[in-house]
């Protein structure tokens, strides 16, 4: 997994709109860090650094966060995850960001992006890839989190799906969707007929019954 680093400063003024606006004019974005074993810590981050980071990470990316005080001393260092981002409704700029610092050895809930790779057999026959879930909600230990899950769908034929039960998740990670939930399917467009194979078992009873009628 790629290593992502971010530096921040402690923020003493909390909840005052004027102070927050002053921060933003200085090119800083307010934020907070919290977790099960730490006190919430108000921080500010250089806007350019945060925007660059947001282009590189997902919700499942581990970020090494270092927070310093006014004198430049490091007062907090922890691996964190992005928990929530507030955007301005008019400008779509980041207004505030929440980071979650997980407790070591304890599980957390997170959404992991899914990346479907390979050209399915069904697509070569005219089928269409329909992605049902772009992310997988999981309960997981922080130590086994991955930035994305790659799923090979090259063997999927017309009308076939890749289900949660087909995933091979690392030990310590559990999907929070039913096992029979499809993640992606190869849809059959109108006008394309799928050949149905008839098994010997299905044909045999008809032959036997025909023999009985002839005996009668």
UniProtKB/Swiss-Prot annotation:
Keywords associated with the record: Ribonucleoprotein, Ribosomal protein, RNA-binding, rRNA-binding
GO molecular function: 5S rRNA binding; structural constituent of ribosome
Subunit (UniProt): Part of the 50S ribosomal subunit; part of the 5S rRNA/L5/L18/L25 subcomplex. Contacts the 5S rRNA. Binds to the 5S rRNA independently of L5 and L18.
4Fe-4S among keywords: no
One Pfam family matching this protein: Ribosomal_TL5_C
Comp. bias regions, Acidic residues: 194-206
SUPFAM superfamilies: Ribosomal protein L25-like
Annotated PANTHER family: RIBOSOMAL PROTEIN L25/GLN-TRNA SYNTHETASE, ANTI-CODON-BINDING DOMAIN-CONTAINING PROTEIN, RIBOSOMAL PROTEIN L25_GLN-TRNA SYNTHETASE, ANTI-CODON-BINDING DOMAIN-CONTAINING PROTEIN
Function recorded in the entry: This is one of the proteins that binds to the 5S RNA in the ribosome where it forms part of the central protuberance.
Taxonomic placement: Bacteria, Thermotogati, Thermotogota, Thermotogae, Thermotogales
InterPro entries found in the cross-reference section: Rbsml_bL25/Gln-tRNA_synth_N (IPR020056), Ribosomal_bL25/Gln-tRNA_synth (IPR011035), Ribosomal_bL25_b-dom (IPR020057), Ribosomal_bL25_C (IPR037121), Ribosomal_bL25_long (IPR001021), Ribosomal_L25_dom (IPR029751), Ribosomal_uL5_bac-type (IPR020930)
Organism of derivation: Thermosipho melanesiensis (strain DSM 12029 / CIP 104789 / BI429)
GO biological process: translation
GO cellular component terms attached to this protein's record: cytosolic large ribosomal subunit
Alphabetized NCBIfam families for the sequence: bL25_bact_ctc
Domain of life (superkingdom): Bacteria
Family label: Belongs to the bacterial ribosomal protein bL25 family. CTC subfamily.
UniProt-recorded name of the protein: Large ribosomal subunit protein bL25
Comp. bias (Basic and acidic residues): 207-216
């Amino acid at each position: 997994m790629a290593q992502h680093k971010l530096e921040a400063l402690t923020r003493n003024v909390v909840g005052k709109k004027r102070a927050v606006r002053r921060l933003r004019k200085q090119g800083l974005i307010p934020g907070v860090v919290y977790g099960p074993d730490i006190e919430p810590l108000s921080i500010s981050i250089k806007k350019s650094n945060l925007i660059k980071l947001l282009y590189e990470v997902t919700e499942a990316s581990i970020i090494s966060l270092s927070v310093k005080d006014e004198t430049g001393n490091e007062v907090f260092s922890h691996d964190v995850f992005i928990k929530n981002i507030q955007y301005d409704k008019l400008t779509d700029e980041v207004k505030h960001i929440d980071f979650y610092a997980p407790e070591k050895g304890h599980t957390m809930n997170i959404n992991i992006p899914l990346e479907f790779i390979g050209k399915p057999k069904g697509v070569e026959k005219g089928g269409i890839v329909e992605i049902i879930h772009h992310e997988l909600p999981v309960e997981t230990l922080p130590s086994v989190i991955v930035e994305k899950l790659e799923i090979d769908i090259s063997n999927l034929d017309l009308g076939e799906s890749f289900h949660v039960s087909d995933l091979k998740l690392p030990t310590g990670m559990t999907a929070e969707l039913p096992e029979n939930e499809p993640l992606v399917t190869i849809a059959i467009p109108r006008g394309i007929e799928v050949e149905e194979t008839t098994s010997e078992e299905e044909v045999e009873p008809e032959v036997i019954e025909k023999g009985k009628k002839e005996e009668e």
